Amino acid sequence: MSWQQRIEQALEERQQSAAYRRRQVNQGGNGRYIQLNGEHYLNFSGNDYLGLSQNAQVIAAWQQGAQQYGVGSGGSGHVTGFSTAHQVLEQQLADWLGYPRALLFISGYAANQALLAALMQAEDRILADRLSHASLLEAAAHSPAQLRRFRHNQPQALADLLAKPCDGQILAVTEGVFSMDGDSAPLAELHRLTRAAGAWLMVDDAHGIGVHGEQGRGSCWQQGVRPELLVVTFGKAFGLSGAAVLCDEPTAEYLLQFARHLIYSTAMPPAQASALQAALHCIRQGDELRARLQDNIQRFRQGAAQLSLTLTESVTAIQPLLVGDNQRALDLAQSLREQGLWVSAIRPPTVPPGGARLRITLTAAHQPQDIDRLLEVLHDVSV
């Protein structure tokens, strides 16, 4: 089979299974409203949970940072790309989350990949929740360590794997809030098990940080857990992009020496680090925003229950409406768009076969009438 035949066959298979992905051109903003293809929609697909991507303080901080530092970092943090703005942000994150150190990465994907690539060796073992993010599972599969996946959110399944002998070190990997189902991991029990076994726990809290816990400190803080490795990302509640790894002092120094994703990537723009400082301030003072988000979640779930909609058990901003069939999910998403609502259809391989869904995400920027409109249209399209 030639290169061209291989590529065309793969594309044809995706199209035939109604799993073909297409990008949409966003022409303005990603907040309560979104403009796509020349049309305005109520946006129920974004991850900007607190509305900070449109926050005036955050925008002004970025502009001021650009005036001070320019629009780019100019290099890796190991060369000339590590600025005062980066240093201050790392210290603020470490103090806020109760860790000795924080290290910035250009994305959550890069942070997850870097940790597993740098830390794991051939005699080690990774125990990953079966529904962990693609960045975690891919990095684990490509690492020299052995990968074993345990049943989703089942501590006993993890305990069984921890009991098996291992010549090296064991790292258990999970998420704080799972991106496709919106459910939360039993972090306290998982950490109890890993500590007892002498293993480490790594938590990717991309969807929990900023939203859960005191001052938005996330899922781990909410459950009274401080894992050995905590990854927080800035593309959701922070309203920007990038990520940080929270860890102890020796691990941070080790990563600075051996994490290739950190060493060989251009650092995030200092202006972005300045904006993230402003976003962190908003999050720490954001009890009202978090309360508004929780009100929206409760309003939606109560209305969905009255309509007998099939949702997951999520009590987070991620509210998946289970459909099953790929084409049916696409058709429903199109019906919602025709009524001015933007909701994404999620299909395999992002979710398991037969697990197609509308991934509804709620934010603090939504108004009660927005939630009511969404429920009204869902009722009309006969989900």
Swiss-Prot record:
In which residues is substrate bound?
A: 21, 133, 350
Alphabetically, the GO molecular function entries are:
8-amino-7-oxononanoate synthase activity; pyridoxal phosphate binding
Q: Which InterPro entries match?
A: Aminotrans_II_pyridoxalP_BS (IPR001917), Aminotransferase_I/II_large (IPR004839), AON_synthase_class-II (IPR050087), AONS_Archaea/Proteobacteria (IPR004723), AONS_Proteobacteria (IPR022834), PyrdxlP-dep_Trfase (IPR015424), PyrdxlP-dep_Trfase_major (IPR015421), PyrdxlP-dep_Trfase_small (IPR015422)
UniProt keyword terms in alphabetical order = Biotin biosynthesis, Pyridoxal phosphate, Transferase
Q: Does the keyword Magnesium apply?
A: no
The residues that hold pyridoxal 5'-phosphate are: 108-109, 179, 207, 233
Among Pfam families, the record links this protein to: Aminotran_1_2
Catalysed transformations (reactions): 6-carboxyhexanoyl-[ACP] + L-alanine + H(+) = (8S)-8-amino-7-oxononanoate + holo-[ACP] + CO2
**What pairs make up the disulfide bonds?**
none
Positions where N6-(pyridoxal phosphate)lysine occurs in the chain:
236
- Supply the EC number(s): 2.3.1.47
Q: Top EC class per UniProt?
A: transferase
Annotated pathway: Cofactor biosynthesis; biotin biosynthesis
- PROSITE patterns to which the protein is assigned, alphabetical: AA_TRANSFER_CLASS_2
Domain of life where this protein originates: Bacteria
Question: Which cofactors does this gene product need?
Answer: pyridoxal 5'-phosphate
| GO biological process entries | biotin biosynthetic process
Return the similarity comment: Belongs to the class-II pyridoxal-phosphate-dependent aminotransferase family. BioF subfamily.
PANTHER family associated with the record: 8-AMINO-7-OXONONANOATE SYNTHASE (PTHR13693:SF100), CLASS II AMINOTRANSFERASE/8-AMINO-7-OXONONANOATE SYNTHASE (PTHR13693)
**Function text:** Catalyzes the decarboxylative condensation of pimeloyl-[acyl-carrier protein] and L-alanine to produce 8-amino-7-oxononanoate (AON), [acyl-carrier protein], and carbon dioxide.
Assembly mode: Homodimer.
NCBIfam families reported in the protein's UniProt record: bioF
Q: What is this protein called?
A: 8-amino-7-oxononanoate synthase
Give the originating organism: Serratia proteamaculans (strain 568)
Q: Which gene encodes it?
A: bioF
